[in-house]
Every structure is written in structure tokens, then in C-alpha cells.
Amino acid sequence: MKILLILACAIACTCGERYCAMKDDTGLSCRNGTASDCESCFNRGDLIWLLANWNFSWSIILIIFITVLQYGRPQFSWFVYGIKMLIMWLLWPIVLALTIFNAYSEYQVSRYVMFGFSIAGAIVTFVLWIMYFVRSIQLYRRTKSWWSFNPETNAILCVSALGRSYVLPLEGVPTGVTLTLLSGNLYAEGFKIAGGMTIDNLPKYVMVALPSRTIVYTLVGKKLKASSATGWAYYVKSKAGDYSTEARTDNLSEQEKLLHMV
């Protein structure tokens, strides 16, 4: 995709016409009115013209973009995070529509090279969009959590306690999982996931769900203080397979719950 973008920019810059950086109020002539040597004119494509005339507007847009990308996390602001997710969800259909429209317009003027680039971009965008939906549905099938449709979510931590399943989106698969209990509140990866917990409610295993499999982490060590309901428990990888992460409330044993298939 980056290669296609670079090629498109190179073609736009080398095949452009003569543009004016400063225009008069009546037409498209240069500001000093000369046709040959105008210091306010340059020979470049549409891309350079846009940068020269809209550089301040683009800088404001990019500042907003940087702010959303850098601080679009739940621990900073849920509002900014929601804007970031909305942008990421809308990018696929917008880019797909733009590439299809550009392919049609290039075909109309018999610019078949750019038409080919536009078709290739549309195909790549559509394939990536379908892959996103496939992976999200696979992850939702395992966790029944709407975090599965977060474009940034590659894995979901699932903790079953008190007959409920608590989930936390992750960017990758951790080597080990640490659950921290502070005054009855359960934390994972620095986020509060449950309240009203005691040391007896800590699970014997936790799971990390991926689109292709579920990894089981077994409890290997803990240090708890019963009087203040404070402490920690550490889990390491023990097995992986097609396991469900849903909390079970029937009378199955721990091993039967673990082997419950999706």
C-alpha cells in the first residue's frame, strides 16, 4: 500500500501543470501579472499546489490526528478513544470508495496506468477489510465480547470469577499474567476489571483468546493478605486449544470447564 502511495505521488508531481502559489482576485494569473518569470508560480502537480495553499489547514488537521492517535486510549479519555475508533472504522469504506471513484475517473480519460493502480488499491483495501471482519468474528465467537471488533485488539484476556467472565483487550499475547487484588478490587494490566473480590475468589486459571486459538494460563504463585483482601497472583502458559472463555455456572469440574469446546 505504501509503495502504491509513493508511486501515485511521484506521478502526480512529475506530470503536473504550472500553478500559481499566489493568485489575484480576478483569475488564475500570477500575482505580479507576468506570464514567464513569476516568483509566485511553480511547475509542480496537484499535490504540491495543495500543500502550498492549504499548509496551515493541513497542519491543524494533522495536529488533531496526532492528538487522537497518541491519547486515544481508555486510560486517558474515553471520548478521544471513541473518536479514534470511529476514524479507524470509517477509514476502510472511505478509502475503498475513493479508490473505486478514482478508478472510474481515470478510465474515463484513458489513463490506464493510474486506473490499474486504483484497481490494485481497491482490491488491497477490500481484502484487508474482509480480513478484519473475519478475525473479529472469530474472536467474538470465543469471547462473546464486543472488544473483538476493536481494530487495535489482537487478543482478549478473560478472567472467570464469581460466576461471571471479565474481559480486557490486549495488543499481544503476554508471557505471563499477573492479577492484583487491592482492597477487594481486582486489577489486570493496570486496569480494574472487578470489585468485591476476596482471596478465595481468585481463579485457578485465566485465558487469553486469539482468533485462531485460546491460551490457558495456570496459577503458579500468589501472595495474599486475607485481612485487607490485598495481594497478587501470577499465571503462566500451560496449554492452548479451541477452548471457550465463557464462564460456566453448572456443576462441571475445573477440568471439564477447561475442556469445554467452542
Curated annotation (Swiss-Prot):
It is a multi-pass membrane protein. Keywords: Glycoprotein, Host Golgi apparatus, Host membrane, Membrane, Transmembrane, Transmembrane helix, Viral envelope protein, Viral matrix protein, Virion. CDD domains: alphaCoV_M. Residues 237-252 are annotated as: Interaction with N protein. One of its GO terms (molecular function) is structural constituent of virion. Homomultimer. Interacts with envelope E protein in the budding compartment of the host cell, which is located between endoplasmic reticulum and the Golgi complex. Forms a complex with HE and S proteins. Interacts with nucleocapsid N protein. This interaction probably participates in RNA packaging into the virus. HAMAP family: ALPHA_CORONA_M. This is Membrane protein. It comes from Porcine respiratory coronavirus (strain RM4) (PRCoV). The gene is M.
